[in-house]
Amino acid sequence: MKDLRMVFKSRITNIHFVGIAGSGMSGIAEVLHNLGYGVSGSDISQNKITDRLKEMGCQIYYKHHQDNIKNAQAVVISSAIKDNNPEVIKAHQLNIPIVPRAEMLAELMRFRFGIAIAGTHGKTTTTSIITHILNMAELDPTYIIGGILNSSGINAKLGESDYLIAEADESDASFLHLQSMLSVITNIDHEHMATYNNDYQKLKDAFVSFSANLPFYGTCIICIDDKGVNEILSDIHRPIITYGFNNGADIQAINIKQVDMQMHFDIIYDKYTKPFPIKLNLIGKHNILNTLAAIGICCELNIKVNIIQKALANFSGVARRLDYHGKLNINNLQISLFDDYGHHPKEISAVFESLKDTYQNKRLVVIFQPHRYSRTHDLFDNFTRILSTADALILLDIYPAQEKPIAHINSSTLADAIRKYSSLNPVVIKNQKKILDILPNIVHNNDVLLTLGAGDIHTLPELLKFNYT
């Protein structure tokens, strides 16, 4: 397989990333650095990701300035970067190629055996499980994941083999750049609708186009349990393997039970003469579906069942996906702390179900930070319904993610709607540190406390552990 460096290394030696700390950007930056490119990048604040990249030898700037790109022959941007960014403006003036993140990922994948995982929910976990199994099989893949693997503390690595595993992002339709050999569609849901002119059919059509990027001998592995996926099934004209709990699935999970913090089930797949058992070191039925997708990929790669079984039994998960942070001691009350990235009602529902199944007869106390005004507006009724099922709820202000406010869409109006819908009385706060003042008055002994959201709430578990352990 031709090395990417041989293709344009003579022309492109230094690559600059605008917004390098983004989950999709940092992984590509790390792989390119390990391929031998000079990598620089800018972001508005220092964090663990920028620290890691700096330790590797990347040049990191903590503000956006035109001088940051002085040595670059290409500038990589994510969809979050606006045209008025000074580095983008300077790149235009100097006629430096401006490369969308997904186009750079596609360039990496073009010279490898690509495995692309798409879907509204479950991409990161599914990608991580596939990566873990391939590593256990000693296939040494390159991988670029939107979350941090708990086992290694990283989200990207340059492998020695031709395999490249990556998430395929539908949020800005950039997954249409990717041309893989194998692909997964986990589900299709109403999310990032502005990209598709608020037309759900256009979103579904994009997933059909994603599947069409496979070669005629490629395979698309899809969840037959999902309504949105079923609606495009007849439009996919590539070999298909289906998975799910449904009796009609090619790969089906049966005999499901939870044992402590594991899911145990059997796999039926007609490639094998009899069912084989799985012990998954994660909780939640949604994670069984993610695992079925991963099994489909790994069976296509002829990975032995015993390796798949061993890998799933010791998979340690992904940061901020039902991440257990241990016990808190709040005024001598013992509280189990979990953290999750969930920010869509369907994701939140899956997390709630998983924790309630695991901690039956215990209260679920939730601290939720809504993410984006547009999402809160579009899914307001669904948020109201799902959040009402918590036993206690603290709402932080909406994390805007560069969006402008929408009239009457805020955490206070969401709290009012929840009060009207149910008997729950949410507490609304503007400052995370205020949680330390009110939490002792909310929790009971043996409660399960969940911090939830895709914004800066990710810093809250450490604050809680610092003060309550």
Swiss-Prot record:
The keyword Aminoacyl-tRNA synthetase does not apply. Its main location: cytoplasm. GO terms for molecular function: ATP binding; UDP-N-acetylmuramate-L-alanine ligase activity. GO terms for biological process: cell division; cell wall organization; peptidoglycan biosynthetic process; regulation of cell shape. SUPFAM superfamilies: MurCD N-terminal domain (SSF51984), MurD-like peptide ligases, catalytic domain (SSF53623), MurD-like peptide ligases, peptide-binding domain (SSF53244). Pathway: Cell wall biogenesis; peptidoglycan biosynthesis. Keywords: ATP-binding, Cell cycle, Cell division, Cell shape, Cell wall biogenesis/degradation, Cytoplasm, Ligase, Nucleotide-binding, Peptidoglycan synthesis. GO terms for cellular component: cytoplasm. It is found in: Cytoplasm. ATP binds at residues 119-125. Its EC number is 6.3.2.8. InterPro entries: Mur-like_cat_sf, Mur_ligase_C, Mur_ligase_C_dom_sf, Mur_ligase_cen, Mur_ligase_N, MurCDEF_pg_biosynth, UDP-N-AcMur_Ala_ligase_MurC. Coiled coil: none annotated. It is an enzyme of class 6 (ligase). Gene3D superfamilies: Mur ligase, C-terminal domain (3.90.190.20), Mur-like, catalytic domain (3.40.1190.10), NAD(P)-binding Rossmann-like Domain (3.40.50.720). Disulfide bonds: none annotated. Pfam families: Mur_ligase (PF01225), Mur_ligase_C (PF02875), Mur_ligase_M (PF08245). It catalyses: UDP-N-acetyl-alpha-D-muramate + L-alanine + ATP = UDP-N-acetyl-alpha-D-muramoyl-L-alanine + ADP + phosphate + H(+). Belongs to the MurCDEF family. HAMAP family: MurC (MF_00046). Cell wall formation. This is UDP-N-acetylmuramate--L-alanine ligase.
